[in-house]
């Protein structure tokens, strides 16, 4: 879904901006136990983003936002941005759309407070974008766990340890897709795009001293 937000976000405001191509792979080791996953290691992830940011800075871009749509990238992107902003002496930032827009997302969803995995939210957004990929007659078979330990992404924890998705869910889903709808997906997409647009146009955010 993250490929959708830059064009939508740019459409929300009139100043000049460019949306670059999305990176097709990221850090997904936690999904490897479920199969059909392509993941890269941190060194590759960092090298790719470093090359992209270096190119943009050399071409005169004054602000760079690395927009993320995958939970497995969040921790690494913080480190990437910290290192590249210093190396290139440029305002390089990152955000994850479903964390940035979480307050608005929570108001739209019925069965969960944030985006999870193949859930009410993600299924709704896919229904809005490529409905031919979704067979809602099978939704009942794709209901995933909603145990308390599976906290909302936007929550906080005081400690962390790595855990594979297979330890959490037998089929990869976390959440309940049965209440998903294309109408809800369109609202989620628009709310997320608007949140990204507000960040892009937040002059104070970009003027923060390094």
Walk through the language-model features, giving the residues of each.
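Extended, histidine- and acidic-residue-enriched regions that form the cofactor-binding/catalytic faces
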Residues: 1-65, 71-210
């Amino acid at each position: 879904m993250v490929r959708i937000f830059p064009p939508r976000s740019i459409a929300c405001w009139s100043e000049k901006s460019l949306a670059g191509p999305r990176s097709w792979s990221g850090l997904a080791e936690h999904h490897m136990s479920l199969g059909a996953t392509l993941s890269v290691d941190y060194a590759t992830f960092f090298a790719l983003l470093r090359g992209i940011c270096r190119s943009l800075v050399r071409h005169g871009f004054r602000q760079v936002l690395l927009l993320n749509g995958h939970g497995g990238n969040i921790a690494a992107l913080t480190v990437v941005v910290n290192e590249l902003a210093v190396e290139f002496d440029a305002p390089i930032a990152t955000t994850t759309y479903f964390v940035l827009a979480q307050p608005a997302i929570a108001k739209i969803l019925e069965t969960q407070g944030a985006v999870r995995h193949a859930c009410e939210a993600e299924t709704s957004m896919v229904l809005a974008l490529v409905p031919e990929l979704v067979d809602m007659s099978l939704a009942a078979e794709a209901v995933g766990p909603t145990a308390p330990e599976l906290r909302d992404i936007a929550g906080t924890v005081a400690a962390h340890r790595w855990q594979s998705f297979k330890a959490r869910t037998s089929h990869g889903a976390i959440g309940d897709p049965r209440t998903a709808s294309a109408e809800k997906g369109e609202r989620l997409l628009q709310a997320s795009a608007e949140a990204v647009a507000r960040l892009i146009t937040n002059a104070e955010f970009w003027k923060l001293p390094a």
